[in-house]
Amino acid sequence: MAKNPPENCEGCHILNAEALKSKKIRKSLKICGLVFGILALTLIVLFWGSKHFWPEVSKKTYGMEHTFYSNGEKKKISMEIDPITRTEIFRSGNGTDETLEVHDFKNGYTGIYFVGLQKCFIKTQIKVIPEFSEPEEEIDENEEITTTFFEQSVIWVPAEKPIENRDFLKNSKILEICDNVTMYWINPTLIAVSELQDFEEDGEDLHFPTSEKKGIDQNEQWVVPQVKVEKTRRTRQASEEDLPVNDYTENGIEFDPMLDERGYCCIYCRRGNRYCRRVCEPLLGYYPYPYCYQGGRVICRVIMPCNWWVARMLGRV
């Protein structure tokens, strides 16, 4: 009979421990439920806010069709703009004369597909509108300067070998259109003054402006006054072969042809060339913008010879 009280006390301790444990479990469940409720409420508020205040990306594809007459024949040009993939597609012609021009603003490429030739030509393009910069200071005539060439004096010539590695067009709309045809890079080739003189000697009837004022009026929409070219700078292109050049390929240096194709430097040039093109300045709307403000803006860049860059790294220039 004397051993019963300790047994009862031991049972009381066990009951108290179980009760305390159940209280801790209930308290933990309450805390977890409160945290879960706060998280759920936060997610609901974020979802509601993003739905009502976050600008939704339009999934609509914009299209436009233009009809015109050429040599008495009715022709159509259609344009399709996809703001999600940032592509712009132009279609013209029918059957074997059909041509597709794809502007991929996301990856910075332009693809031109000719159905009759079953060939695709690729060139690079800008991805964004360049920032406006102040006009350059006047350059001394006696200084070694570059020659300015405008887009009208550039011919796009395809490369001799087709493109083998197409991984750079993996996520581009161009690859979907040109996947089963041969693809070539096209490179800008400058028209020298000597070539224009050859046309005159052959008896071609070329209608050049008879006065300086008339020439400026005709080209006013293409050339801005800040980048007009002097005649003395044009004529220096004819004697370009007489200029000295440091050819580092004799020392075992080989230039990647992609440097020339992408426009980083010119492998076979003896002097730098200033290449100008007209860039469409947007009037708001979805990207890519199909509208140009006052015909666009002239953007120029200087492409130096690849040998010049090597000489600069060696400290020779």
UniProtKB/Swiss-Prot annotation:
SS bond partners: C120-C178
Membrane-topology descriptor: Single-pass type II membrane protein
List of residues that carry Phosphoserine: S239
Keyword Chloroplast: no
InterPro entries in UniProt: BRICHOS_dom, Chondromodulin/Tenomodulin
Main location as per UniProt: membrane
Transmembrane portions of the chain: 31-50
Segments on the Extracellular side according to the record's topology features: 51-317
Subcellular location as annotated: Membrane; Nucleus envelope
Tissues expressed in: Highly expressed in tendons.
UniProt KW keywords: Disulfide bond, Glycoprotein, Membrane, Nucleus, Phosphoprotein, Signal-anchor, Transmembrane, Transmembrane helix
Record-linked PANTHER family: CHONDROMODULIN-RELATED, TENOMODULIN
Function: May be an angiogenesis inhibitor.
Protein name per UniProt: Tenomodulin
Lineage: Eukaryota, Metazoa, Chordata, Craniata, Vertebrata
